Amino acid sequence: MVETDRTRVLIDCGPDFRQQMLQQPFRKIDGVLVTHAHYDHVGGMDDIRPFCTFGEINVYADRRAAGNLRQMMPYCFEEHLYPGVPRIHLNTITPHRMLTINELHIMPITVMHDKLPILGFRIGTLLYITDMKTIGHEEMEYIKGIDTLVVNALRFEPDHHSHLVVSEALDFARRVGASRTYFTHICHGMGLHEEVNRQLPHGVQLAYDGQTIEW
């Protein structure tokens, strides 16, 4: 979740969304950015319904993911909505076309999740990427000047067909030139948090649930 004094934006809404949000103040969600529509990234979307107390929630996704969401949650997009369903306004977004949510200026970029193009998001000097395996050279133009990187790093080994492993994530962090890098989307085989952090270079660490990063 990206949060300022006046704006709150989710990046993806996984199955544990409700559990995570029980620990946070109950306030308006100004938007949900969807990287892609695999269940581990959108499986908690129905649980945004309490936040519709504050009004309709804007969800931003590319054309493919928007279509997937309509199939997964058809009851949210019918002409006559059943009382109590999540009130979602689905916005189709395009890579490299800036979108603005209140004071946040957000640049979607394309990364590859194996053969599936998905979205990453640049917000100021923060870059958030998940489920990436490769990135096109042309995308690097849109991520110059990044200071803080959040990126997936599944495990040390073996290699994986659709996710970065640690060595690849470290290479990408060096290419980006971020001063701080946080690894996320980690599998159970990675190892213990403190032990892994001791193996990582300066400026790189594993992220954890509930962590706050200021940039």
Model feature map: region roles:
Residues I135-W215:
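Cap/insert and terminal regions of metallo-dependent hydrolase folds
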